[in-house]
């Protein structure tokens, strides 16, 4: 049981590329005895060396807590995302009821002028870094009710949006794809300073 080696040579970590010194053709600092000993010590023991920012971003993408701001029929599709067929929790995307414990807010449905201050208040209660997914045509730009006197024409007028999920209503697959895009965006950009 286990992996059988193809050859009898021991596994060795990749050599760091770093900044190459043109005169020697080796990375700068490669002849430093201190770092040479550390590299030799860690190379054969299976350690992975990375930056703290990359580690934090990796952990953040795998443990996003979301809260719903379900305002209309898109919320039904959002509920379907948590059911066994799609099971968004396998991607580390778990629901929370309190904005103080959540990282992501999903705005699903028609945002009215009377509801806009409540949306902003809930957004302000979320800890940094916080992300917002706008789900459906009504949340994205007013949708079917775009010309109504009481509808905000897109929740991006109230809170900054990170991911837009189009559709009326968007399917659970589309929302799941939006969640995966948000995780990719966090990995790529790190913490977003607002």
UniProtKB/Swiss-Prot annotation:
Where is it predominantly found? Answer: membrane
Q: What function does the entry list? A: NDH-1 shuttles electrons from NADH, via FMN and iron-sulfur (Fe-S) centers, to quinones in the respiratory chain. The immediate electron acceptor for the enzyme in this species is believed to be ubiquinone. Couples the redox reaction to proton translocation (for every two electrons transferred, four hydrogen ions are translocated across the cytoplasmic membrane), and thus conserves the redox energy in a proton gradient.
Query: Which organism does this sequence originate in?
Result: Rhizobium etli (strain CIAT 652)
Per UniProt, the cofactor note for this protein states:
Binds 1 [4Fe-4S] cluster.
Q: Which gene encodes it?
A: nuoB1
Name any Gene Ontology BP term: electron transport coupled proton transport
Q: What chemistry does it catalyse, as a reaction equation?
A: a quinone + NADH + 5 H(+)(in) = a quinol + NAD(+) + 4 H(+)(out)
Q: Which NCBIfam families match?
A: nuoB_fam (TIGR01957), PRK06411.1 (NF005012)
EC assignment: the record states 7.1.1.-
Query: HAMAP family attached here?
Result: NDH1_NuoB
Q: Would you tell me the Gene Ontology cellular component terms?
A: plasma membrane; respiratory chain complex I
PANTHER family in the cross-refs = NADH DEHYDROGENASE, NADH DEHYDROGENASE [UBIQUINONE] IRON-SULFUR PROTEIN 7, MITOCHONDRIAL
Instruction: Supply the InterPro entries for this chain.
Output: NADH_UbQ_OxRdtase-like_20kDa, NADH_UQ_OxRdtase_20Kd_su
**UniProt-annotated binding residues for [4Fe-4S] cluster:** 73-74, 138, 168
Protein family (similarity comment): Belongs to the complex I 20 kDa subunit family.
Extract the GO molecular function terms from the UniProt entry.
4 iron, 4 sulfur cluster binding; iron ion binding; NADH dehydrogenase (ubiquinone) activity; NADH:ubiquinone reductase (non-electrogenic) activity; quinone binding
The membrane topology of this protein is: Peripheral membrane protein
- Cross-referenced SUPFAM superfamilies, in alphabetical order? HydA/Nqo6-like (SSF56770)
Q: How does it assemble?
A: NDH-1 is composed of 14 different subunits. Subunits NuoB, C, D, E, F, and G constitute the peripheral sector of the complex.
The entry's keywords: 4Fe-4S, Cell inner membrane, Cell membrane, Iron, Iron-sulfur, Membrane, Metal-binding, NAD, Quinone, Translocase, Transport, Ubiquinone
> One Pfam family this chain carries?
Oxidored_q6
Q: What is this protein called?
A: NADH-quinone oxidoreductase subunit B 1
- The highest taxon in the source lineage is Bacteria
């Amino acid at each position: 049981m286990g992996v059988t080696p193809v050859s009898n040579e021991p596994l060795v970590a990749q050599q760091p590329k770093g900044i190459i010194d043109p005169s020697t053709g080796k990375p700068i600092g490669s002849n430093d005895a201190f770092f040479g000993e550390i590299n030799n010590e860690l190379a054969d023991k299976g350690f992975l060396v990375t930056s703290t920012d990359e580690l934090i971003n990796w952990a953040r993408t795998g443990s996003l807590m979301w809260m719903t701001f379900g305002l209309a029929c898109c919320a039904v599709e959002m509920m379907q995302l948590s059911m066994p067929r799609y099971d968004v929790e396998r991607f580390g995307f778990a629901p929370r009821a309190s904005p103080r414990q959540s990282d992501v807010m999903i705005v699903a449905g028609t945002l009215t002028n009377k509801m806009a201050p409540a949306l902003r208040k809930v957004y302000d209660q979320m800890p940094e870094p916080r992300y917002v997914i706008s789900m459906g045509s009504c949340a994205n730009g007013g949708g079917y009710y775009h010309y109504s006197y009481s509808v905000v024409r897109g929740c991006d007028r109230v809170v900054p949006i990170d991911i837009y999920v189009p559709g009326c209503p968007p399917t659970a697959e589309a929302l799941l794809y939006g969640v995966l895009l948000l995780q990719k965006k966090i990995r790529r950009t790190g913490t977003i300073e607002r």
